[in-house]
């Protein structure tokens, strides 16, 4: 009988290298928020991938960056604390970009950790095959990686091979989660993240990190219909106007797009009601951050 393997894998890397795209690809559902704006992942969203011979729990950590406020400080602590809890580390980089100071900072941190580290070069669909080996060699000068695997999370290139590589390093272990469970976050948290993703896609650079979403109510009204009421928080009146849009058009489009993803997640029809409120400087208010679901890790 084939042994069953299981383990926890941390995905770490600079903002926007494709960590959330990878999690969503291997889980097969949209769990982690995706956006072209930096610092969009605010929590350790666990994606659970269950196969017949293995269960892999992915921790999609916030991108490494220099904190500018209490929320940013929290995001950094989540990223670094995660490294002590896991069986292996995926260090993901954008193969289409030069090695930056952020990458160097992460590699210096990883050198001090005994956990296996896989270098995952993402976005190989954007570079010519001849350019791949020289870029890999540059990373090998910084540290010894357990494995080096090029992939495209967006296109799915080489992802199945990488999953097999991960499984070869996992210990024998049980299923930690039921077969049909894909995340350890409450559905309300994931719903709020889906709403926030649509706002990030539809608003300008000024808005992204000032946005928080709280799901106030989520009620199953009948067998195939769920009612969701959520509040979108911004820090300034001008941002409120941007999110709502002229004649409420922007907010209506946010609701329409979010509803489609939420219906796919829940497998039910969704009635979604959204409000926009100003909560000045909320990212520096610890209690408010906790209320939004970005809880402090406890020992």
UniProtKB/Swiss-Prot annotation:
<dbReference type="InterPro" id="IPR009019">
    <property type="entry name" value="KH_sf_prok-type"/>
</dbReference>
<dbReference type="GO" id="GO:0005829">
    <property type="term" value="C:cytosol"/>
</dbReference>
<feature type="domain" description="KH type-2">
    <location>
        <begin position="203"/>
        <end position="280"/>
    </location>
</feature>
<keyword id="KW-0547">Nucleotide-binding</keyword>
<dbReference type="InterPro" id="IPR015946">
    <property type="entry name" value="KH_dom-like_a/b"/>
</dbReference>
<dbReference type="GO" id="GO:0003924">
    <property type="term" value="F:GTPase activity"/>
</dbReference>
<keyword id="KW-0699">rRNA-binding</keyword>
<dbReference type="InterPro" id="IPR004044">
    <property type="entry name" value="KH_dom_type_2"/>
</dbReference>
<feature type="binding site">
    <location>
        <begin position="60"/>
        <end position="64"/>
    </location>
    <ligand>
        <name>GTP</name>
    </ligand>
</feature>
<feature type="region of interest" description="G2">
    <location>
        <begin position="39"/>
        <end position="43"/>
    </location>
</feature>
<dbReference type="InterPro" id="IPR005662">
    <property type="entry name" value="GTPase_Era-like"/>
</dbReference>
<dbReference type="GO" id="GO:0070181">
    <property type="term" value="F:small ribosomal subunit rRNA binding"/>
</dbReference>
<feature type="region of interest" description="G5">
    <location>
        <begin position="151"/>
        <end position="153"/>
    </location>
</feature>
<comment type="subunit">
    <text>Monomer.</text>
</comment>
<dbReference type="GO" id="GO:0043024">
    <property type="term" value="F:ribosomal small subunit binding"/>
</dbReference>
<protein>
    <recommendedName>
        <fullName>GTPase Era</fullName>
    </recommendedName>
</protein>
<dbReference type="GO" id="GO:0005525">
    <property type="term" value="F:GTP binding"/>
</dbReference>
<comment type="function">
    <text>An essential GTPase that binds both GDP and GTP, with rapid nucleotide exchange. Plays a role in 16S rRNA processing and 30S ribosomal subunit biogenesis and possibly also in cell cycle regulation and energy metabolism.</text>
</comment>
<dbReference type="InterPro" id="IPR030388">
    <property type="entry name" value="G_ERA_dom"/>
</dbReference>
<keyword id="KW-0694">RNA-binding</keyword>
<dbReference type="InterPro" id="IPR027417">
    <property type="entry name" value="P-loop_NTPase"/>
</dbReference>
<keyword id="KW-1003">Cell membrane</keyword>
<keyword id="KW-0963">Cytoplasm</keyword>
<keyword id="KW-0690">Ribosome biogenesis</keyword>
<dbReference type="InterPro" id="IPR005225">
    <property type="entry name" value="Small_GTP-bd"/>
</dbReference>
<dbReference type="Pfam" id="PF07650">
    <property type="entry name" value="KH_2"/>
</dbReference>
<feature type="binding site">
    <location>
        <begin position="122"/>
        <end position="125"/>
    </location>
    <ligand>
        <name>GTP</name>
    </ligand>
</feature>
<feature type="domain" description="Era-type G">
    <location>
        <begin position="5"/>
        <end position="172"/>
    </location>
</feature>
<feature type="region of interest" description="G1">
    <location>
        <begin position="13"/>
        <end position="20"/>
    </location>
</feature>
<dbReference type="GO" id="GO:0005886">
    <property type="term" value="C:plasma membrane"/>
</dbReference>
<keyword id="KW-0472">Membrane</keyword>
<comment type="similarity">
    <text>Belongs to the TRAFAC class TrmE-Era-EngA-EngB-Septin-like GTPase superfamily. Era GTPase family.</text>
</comment>
<dbReference type="GO" id="GO:0000028">
    <property type="term" value="P:ribosomal small subunit assembly"/>
</dbReference>
<feature type="binding site">
    <location>
        <begin position="13"/>
        <end position="20"/>
    </location>
    <ligand>
        <name>GTP</name>
    </ligand>
</feature>
<dbReference type="InterPro" id="IPR006073">
    <property type="entry name" value="GTP-bd"/>
</dbReference>
<keyword id="KW-0342">GTP-binding</keyword>
<dbReference type="Pfam" id="PF01926">
    <property type="entry name" value="MMR_HSR1"/>
</dbReference>
<feature type="region of interest" description="G3">
    <location>
        <begin position="60"/>
        <end position="63"/>
    </location>
</feature>
<feature type="region of interest" description="G4">
    <location>
        <begin position="122"/>
        <end position="125"/>
    </location>
</feature>
């Amino acid at each position: 009988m084939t042994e069953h393997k299981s383990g926890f894998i941390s995905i770490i890397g600079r903002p926007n290298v494709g960590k959330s795209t990878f999690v969503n690809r291997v889980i097969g559902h949209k769990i982690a928020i995706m956006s072209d704006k930096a610092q969009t992942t605010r929590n350790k969203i666990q994606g659970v991938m269950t196969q017949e011979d293995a269960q892999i729990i992915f921790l999609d950590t916030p991108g490494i960056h220099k904190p500018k406020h209490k929320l940013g400080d929290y995001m950094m602590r989540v990223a670094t604390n995660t490294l002590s809890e896991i069986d292996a580390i995926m260090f993901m980089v954008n193969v289409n970009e030069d090695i930056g100071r952020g990458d160097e900072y992460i590699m210096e941190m990883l050198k001090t950790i005994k956990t296996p580290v896989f270098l995952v070069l993402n976005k190989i669909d954007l570079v010519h095959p001849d350019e791949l080996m020289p870029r890999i060699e540059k990373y090998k000068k910084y540290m010894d990686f357990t494995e080096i695997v090029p992939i495209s999370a967006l296109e799915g290139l080489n992802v199945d091979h990488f999953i097999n590589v991960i499984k070869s390093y996992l210990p024998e272990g049980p299923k930690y989660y039921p077969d049909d469970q894909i995340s350890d976050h409450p559905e309300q948290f994931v719903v709020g993240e889906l709403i926030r993703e649509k706002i990030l896609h539809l608003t300008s650079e000024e808005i992204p990190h000032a946005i928080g979403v709280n799901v106030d109510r989520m009620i199953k009204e009948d067998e195939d219909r769920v009612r969701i009421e959520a509040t979108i928080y911004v820090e300034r009146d001008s941002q409120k106007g941007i999110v709502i849009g002229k004649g409420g058009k922007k907010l209506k489009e946010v609701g329409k797009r979010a509803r489609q993803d939420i219906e796919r997640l829940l497998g039910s029809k969704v009635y979604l009601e959204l409000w926009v409120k100003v909560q000045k400087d909320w990212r520096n208010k610890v209690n408010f951050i906790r209320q939004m679901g970005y809880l402090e890790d406890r020992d």
